[in-house]
Amino acid sequence: MSRYRGPRFKKIRRLGALPGLTSKRPKAGSDLRNQSRSVKKSQYRIRLEEKQKLRFHYGLTERQLLKYVRIAGKAKGSTGQVLLQLLEMRLDNILFRLGMALTIPQARQLVNHGHILVNGRIVDIPSYRCKPRDIITVKDDQNSRTLVQNLLDSSAPEELPNHLTLHTFQYEGLVNQIIDRKCVGLKINELLVVEYYSRQT
């Protein structure tokens, strides 16, 4: 299944706020109206919607998300929490959380077009897994820096999560540590996502 490129508001109206996909928010009460017209959700549908929420927020294909679930399942610790850590430490998501892009798809474009360096080297793979002490910088090029400066100016001021530091004037971000669960930027029940996949096998 390919990455979603359809109407974004349609997704957030059904699944709730997906800040990585779009800065728009569903209107207050729209979910309640939808629920009043529909029958009670099955457990399968509840798990499916949590999975879809994760997939659309981080901009993943079904195959990519399944791969991350399998990696998380083999790691030590809670599969759900490891899954969120893997997704949050992707380079495209780190740029989004730093405010260098308004959405994750926008961050992905910055990476694909060679505007971003990690530890002094251009990285053009959005799924690159960042590690503690990684230094993310914008290429020392007028076009790259003007582009990112415009995005920084456009982004709503939000408190940075503890695992990141931003040096705006140097166009530089620092990964301090692996993200804590409480700093994940999406309202999600990751256990339902793990359950969804465990029941598919």
Curated annotation (Swiss-Prot):
GO MF, one example: structural constituent of ribosome
Any GO BP annotation: ribosomal small subunit biogenesis
Keywords: Chloroplast, Plastid, Ribonucleoprotein, Ribosomal protein, RNA-binding, rRNA-binding
Subcellular location as annotated: Plastid, Chloroplast
Main location: plastid
CC terms in the record's Gene Ontology section: chloroplast; small ribosomal subunit
Domain S4 RNA-binding: residue ranges: 89-152
Keyword presence, Transport: no
Record-annotated membrane-spanning stretches: none
Gene3D superfamilies associated with the record: Ribosomal Protein S4 Delta 41, Chain A, domain 1, RNA-binding S4 domain
Subunit-structure text: Part of the 30S ribosomal subunit. Contacts protein S5. The interaction surface between S4 and S5 is involved in control of translational fidelity.
Biological function: One of the primary rRNA binding proteins, it binds directly to 16S rRNA where it nucleates assembly of the body of the 30S subunit.
Family that this chain belongs to: Belongs to the universal ribosomal protein uS4 family.
NCBIfam families: PRK05327.1 (NF003717), rpsD_bact (TIGR01017)
Protein name: Small ribosomal subunit protein uS4c
